[in-house]
């Protein structure tokens, strides 16, 4: 899954750069997306080159009816939720506010991309375990996925919150500094989404996409209702006056509240239908991250960071302090270290990619 997306995204990015440098206009930005999707489709098709194409039967259609239709319905609301924040800010505020929000949202989305990686790895594994009725293995897999993802994302989000202004100055510009609080909130949104994904995949991989789809639709509706309350100062058409008028911050809070609601609901549903309970590791990591964040906040008040390598160094120190405290508490073990070492080892990754490309069916 990753390789076609990497190739397609790389080609699309090169076209973006060429279009900007050569002044080709916005039409080439749209063409870049189209070309990228076509490239991804071609490479994805190549992966299925050894699979025969058979005539669909009633069993195939029934499986799509059970799984694909709920997911498709949820996807429609998901797209609406994805763009509703910018739409509401644009309607009730100005293009300037939309630009501030969109700019810092790009940074927060970098954290959220890990959710896609989790789904790509977990969904087939959980589906296979569910088919073989290995419920205990599913429980272990969900807990491990949440724990390992939290080990990476929690300190990353904590450092994003602490150094939000410096991140904006280094990667955007000082014009985006008014959106510092929005970046902090959206970083929390990304964290909640990533930590929710193992639980969502557990339900979908166990043949309950209907539950996650209904939850996605309800959360989209909740998010829109909250935006109507938090974003505008007033909606005279509806007779609503003296609203919160938080603008971009209100949109970010609306998304955060809806994602937290989704997270709580996913865990309740996972317990009810799969008998999977949350573990305490997550709460330990959150407490440690809060302590580290407070300490680094004091450091941030006393020093000036205005270069990218200084920013990476200070954030790295925060991450190292986070892991060190977990190590002292016994929440980070040699097994965890070996797991991350193998995951990040270029030699292991090269071997894995080579096996995928040269696999023998």
Where are the regions that the model predicts?
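Short alpha-helical transmembrane interface motifs in multi-pass membrane proteins
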Residues: 1, 66-73, 104-109, 148-152, ...
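Hydrophobic alpha-helical transmembrane bundles that constitute the permease/transmembrane domains
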Residues: 5-14, 33-42, 64, 68, ...
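Membrane-interface helix-loop junctions in multi-pass transport and translocation proteins
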Residues: 10-41, 207-210, 217-264, 276, ...
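Membrane-embedded alpha-helical segments of multi-pass transporters/permeases
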Residues: 13, 17-21, 41-46, 87, ...
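Specific pore-lining/lateral-gate transmembrane helices of multi-pass inner-membrane transport
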Residues: 100-217
């Amino acid at each position: 899954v990753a390789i076609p997306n990497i190739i397609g995204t790389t080609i699309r990015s090169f076209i973006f750069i060429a279009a900007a440098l050569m002044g080709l206009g916005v039409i080439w930005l749209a063409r870049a997306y189209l070309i990228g999707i076509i490239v991804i489709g071609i490479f994805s098709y190549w992966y299925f080159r050894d699979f025969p194409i058979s005539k669909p039967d009633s069993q195939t259609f029934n499986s799509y009816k059970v799984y694909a239709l709920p997911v498709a319905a949820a996807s429609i609301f998901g797209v609406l939720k994805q763009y509703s924040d910018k739409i509401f800010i644009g309607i009730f505020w100005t293009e300037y506010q939309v630009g501030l929000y969109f700019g810092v949202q790009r940074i927060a989305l970098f954290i959220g991309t890990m959710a896609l990686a989790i789904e790509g790895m977990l969904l087939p594994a959980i589906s296979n375990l569910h088919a073989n009725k290995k419920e205990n293995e599913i429980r272990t897999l969900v807990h491990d996925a949440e724990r390992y993802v939290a080990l990476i994302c929690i300190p990353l989000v904590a450092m994003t919150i602490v150094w939000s202004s410096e991140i904006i100055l280094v990667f955007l510009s000082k014009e985006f500094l008014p959106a510092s609080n929005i970046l902090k909130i959206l970083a929390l949104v990304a964290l909640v989404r990533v930590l929710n994904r193992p639980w969502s995949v557990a339900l979908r991989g166990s043949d309950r996409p209907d539950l996650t789809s209904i939850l996605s639709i309800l959360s989209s509706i909740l998010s829109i209702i909250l935006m109507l309350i938090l974003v505008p100062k007033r909606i005279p058409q509806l007779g609503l006056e003296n609203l919160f008028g938080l603008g971009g911050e209100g949109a970010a809070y609306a998304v955060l509240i809806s994602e937290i609601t989704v997270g709580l609901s996913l865990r309740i549903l996972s317990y009810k239908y799969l008998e999977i309970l949350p573990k305490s590791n997550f709460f330990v990591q959150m407490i440690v991250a809060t302590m580290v964040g407070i300490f680094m906040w004091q450091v941030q008040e006393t020093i000036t960071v205005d270069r990218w390598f200084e920013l990476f160094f200070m954030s790295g120190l925060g991450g190292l302090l986070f892991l060190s405290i977990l190590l002292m508490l016994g929440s980070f073990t040699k097994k965890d270290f070996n797991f991350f070492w193998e995951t990040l080892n270029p030699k292991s990754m090269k071997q894995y990619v080579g096996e995928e490309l040269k696999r023998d069916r």
